[in-house]
Amino acid sequence: MANSAQARKRARTALKQRAHNASLRTAFRTAVKKVLKAIEAGDKAAARVVFQASEKVIDRIADKGVFHKNKAARHKSRLSAQIKAMA
């Protein structure tokens, strides 16, 4: 239990930030799933459009520090490779 006023405030702030980060991670997962769904459907044009939207989400999460920038780059690279591999 936080004893000082500063520690109590940091505990409150941490809870708020944890909830915000959770929503960002959820947005990331949703964006990736949309791209994968478009890839499975075989629609390359739609996959590109959805991928561009998901890139923004992934970059934003990396900038905020929720994910490491290398993890974000890895996800973008793998999704891009899957789109390029489509016939």
Swiss-Prot record:
Residues covered by region (Disordered): 1-20
Record has Zinc-finger as a keyword: no
InterPro entries referenced in this protein's UniProt entry, alphabetically: Ribosomal_bS20 (IPR002583), Ribosomal_bS20_sf (IPR036510)
GO molecular function term, any single one: small ribosomal subunit rRNA binding
Residue ranges that the Swiss-Prot or TrEMBL entry lists as coiled coil: none
One cellular-component annotation, GO: small ribosomal subunit
UniProt entry keywords in alphabetical sequence: Ribonucleoprotein, Ribosomal protein, RNA-binding, rRNA-binding
Record-stated family: Belongs to the bacterial ribosomal protein bS20 family.
HAMAP family according to UniProt: Ribosomal_bS20
Stated name of the protein: Small ribosomal subunit protein bS20
Source species of the chain: Chromobacterium violaceum (strain ATCC 12472 / DSM 30191 / JCM 1249 / CCUG 213 / NBRC 12614 / NCIMB 9131 / NCTC 9757 / MK)
Gene that specifies this protein: rpsT
